[in-house]
Amino acid sequence: MLRFRKVAPSLKNGGNLKLFSTSSTLKKIASSQPLRAKQVSTSESVKYPVIDHTYDAIVVGAGGAGLRATFGLAEAGFNTACITKLFPTRSHTVAAQGGINAALGNMTKDDWRWHFYDTVKGSDWLGDQDAIHYMTKEAPKAVLELEHFGVPFSRTKEGKIYQRAFGGQSLEYGKGGQAYRCAAVADRTGHSILHTLYGQSLKHNTNFFIEYFAMDLIMEGGECRGVIAMNLEDGSIHRFRAHKTILATGGYGRAYFSCTSAHTCTGDGNAMVSRAGLPLQDLEFVQFHPTGIYGAGCLITEGCRGEGGYLLNSKGERFMERYAPTAKDLASRDVVSRAMTVEIREGRGVGPEKDHCYLQLSHLPAEILKERLPGISETAAIFAGVDVTKEPIPVLPTVHYNMGGIPTRFTGEVLTIDENGKDKIVPGLYAAGEAACVSVHGGNRLGANSLLDIVVFGRACALHIKDTLEPNTPHKPLAADAGLDSLKFLDQIRTSQGPKHTSEIRLDMQKTMQRDVSVFRMEETLQEGVKNIARVDGTYKDIGIRDRGLIWNTDLVEALELRNLLTCAVQTANAALNRKESRGAHAREDYPERDDKNWIKHTLTWQHKTGDPVTLKYRAVTRTTMDENEVKPVPPFKRVY
């Protein structure tokens, strides 16, 4: 039998479990681990030291959304903890290259209402227009705030923030030509934003728990009371009690074989929500970025095309002129990815196997490449062996972003539905960033709206908590056995002796998703996909962990991450099979048209634990804005670029 024991910290620390709250900034940076737990000698056969922590608010994840929420809360006087499974500046936000959208009007006249229009159109009318209204209106303020925090934006000759062209962006509600709306730090925008936000978090009284793996939410009576996490350094278990919990854990790109995501993008927050009996939303909408390096999957930013690069087929033809006569290579990502796939299918691909396309940059002046795309020149040389001043880059559509995730309001509050199908807020639980589905991206995200999303909605979570909670509000006691199921599962999986290795099951899952739930989808392949991913999901019980230790057990962590990926993958395949239309990134060859009469609605999916069947329901898309006196809703029309 497993029982929780509170473990007393060393008396040298004065018995204070929240050591980081009194640590100097230097110690916060130097230490990745604020607590040292000692194993309790008990009669149980399995011994896990368990430590309880109490905070006003906790944030899981230290990417852009998590850090913006964290220091927003700390700045407002809340005792705040940030739990992250890796060092904050290794979070995947660091990989965002192109920029962040905001209607600053530094290059041409611009208006946030035009940005609103482009985002609704880009979402293929699956985006909630109240949330899009909020995001696009807040965008200029968010970017100027980042500038004040210290983000070193590239500059025009006049000293203004430099803005480049990006796909799907227009002026005057689509009638005024290409917009230059994407504020950039060369081609390393995410890197700069992440480091700046981390610096701001250290500046405020933030308590970091670095290299702690969040396993599950602690739920009581439908309310989120915190999370249970494992310290990867020593295997100790930590229960974090808080009035408010924010999940900012990123996407689940690693469910696919070829993706631009870091190996840490495993849908942890999504799966935690699913295991808590709550729904995930719109998982069928998986964005394929048009330009991942062929064979490596590394991202080549859309900024390349924004600076004047273009795609070529084997005939040397700029084929996007046929698919998007106006926007050409700067059409939305789903349009470009499908066009590339069609070119390859019809035999106009390049290379010995005619299975990819070329991105041409060599016509651009060398000084432009050096100043505005320095990282791309380096990436292409390392991963494709290409000198971009002389040769094209071999590229292929690659899984890049999850439009779906944890359903939330624009305040960050997590939603479910009641027995009558009406929206219901989950008390104490918030989500932001790629883990969340607000939904501002709907069926397809516009490039450079993701960095905007994380900053705006990370901040929105902090603002809503500030408005609804007083710092140092007393806590209700936590049930003595809270999190016990998580600990039982951890013990079960750590000691599992099945015949299958984590990597074997993971590869099976990735190949299945890449083959059956890809750029183009059909009933037959999706049925196969649902059947195959259910089979893979069923093999998880056969997993075997070779390392029985608790200290830096990467085998165990990968097994836990695989469970999370499977939860996301199974629901993605089921949601895709059930949506009988083509919308945004969900392209059905057997249902090639968008069906606004039946399918302007969000998919909700439930799967309580690995191996369980998936339940599907639907909820309405918000088709009104926050204030029609500010901006009118955009009614659906045929989406062309």
UniProtKB/Swiss-Prot annotation:
GO terms for biological process: mitochondrial electron transport, succinate to ubiquinone; tricarboxylic acid cycle. It comes from the Eukaryota. It is a peripheral membrane protein. It is an enzyme of class 1 (oxidoreductase). The active site is at R333. Substrate binds at H289, T301, H400, R445. The keyword Transit peptide applies. FAD binds at residues 61-66, 84-99, 268, 434, 450-451. Gene3D superfamilies: FAD/NAD(P)-binding domain, Fumarate reductase/succinate dehydrogenase flavoprotein-like, C-terminal domain, succinate dehydrogenase protein domain, Succinate dehydrogenase/fumarate reductase flavoprotein, catalytic domain. Belongs to the FAD-dependent oxidoreductase 2 family. FRD/SDH subfamily. Flavoprotein (FP) subunit of succinate dehydrogenase (SDH) that is involved in complex II of the mitochondrial electron transport chain and is responsible for transferring electrons from succinate to ubiquinone (coenzyme Q). This is Probable succinate dehydrogenase [ubiquinone] flavoprotein subunit, mitochondrial. It comes from Schizosaccharomyces pombe (strain 972 / ATCC 24843).
